[in-house]
Structures are given as C-alpha cells and as structure tokens.
Amino acid sequence: MTKKVTVLGSTGSIGTQSLDVIRAQEYSVFGLAAHSNVELLLRQVQEFHPHCIAVVDDAAADRAARELHGMPGAPVLLRGKEGLEELAAMDGSDIVLNAVVGIAGLAATLSAIKSGRDVALANKESLVTGGH
C-alpha cells in the first residue's frame, strides 16, 4: 500500500531532498507546505498533485490563490500558521514530515501527533522545546 506523505517545509533544503526520496520510492504526496516560496511550491504542485497545500505568509498565500485559480485539479489552499497546523492534522495523510525551520514547526508537530499521524521530524526545535 502506498503511503501518503505531507511535507511541511517542502521548499526548503530538507523538504526538497525529502521530495527526491518520495519521488524515487513512489510514495504519494498528500500535502505540501511552504512559508513564502510560491514559485517552487507551485512547481511541486504540478509534479506531485497534492490534495492540499498551506502557505504561511499572507502575501504569498494571495499569490498562490491567484496562480491556482482555474487550475484543473488544483489543491485546497490553506493559509497562515493555522493552515499549517490544519494540514498537519488532516485526515488522508499517513506520515507528516516536518522540515519547518525553527520553533515555527512545533505547533504543526503537536497537531500531527494529536491527530494520530506518524511524524518524521527534521525539526529539532520540536524535540528541544516540546519535550520534558
């Protein structure tokens, strides 16, 4: 059975490397998230056809909405930090890979865990600040 993966931070170095592995292993991409690199995110959308994407930065989310408008099979667009957390918790994904830089990734990690998703961490802050 093909695992469905959500990659948070898909436009960063770790995120793009993760997508290289996903591509080679024939995993399915359920969701992608970026802070503001809409150009790369949209290229990833064209290749991986995710069900949903999240863009944290407001201006970048507006640009993504314009670019996605009228696109056949366009993914659902979530916005802001809340959108990132919603994507992390969304049903349909088997694994959430968190490659978000810094403390910004903690809330998304917690959302994924609370919703029962398997979490792959490339975000040490989630361990350092979220642990006891």
Model-found features: residue ranges?
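Short beta->alpha connector loops at strand-helix junctions that form conserved
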Residues: 56-57, 122-124
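A short hydrophobic/small-residue beta-strand
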Residues: 118-119
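N-terminal glycine-/serine-/threonine-rich beta1-alpha1-beta2 phosphate-ribose binding loop
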Residues: 1-103
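Rossmann-fold NAD(P)-binding glycine/threonine-rich loop
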Residues: 64, 103-115, 124-132
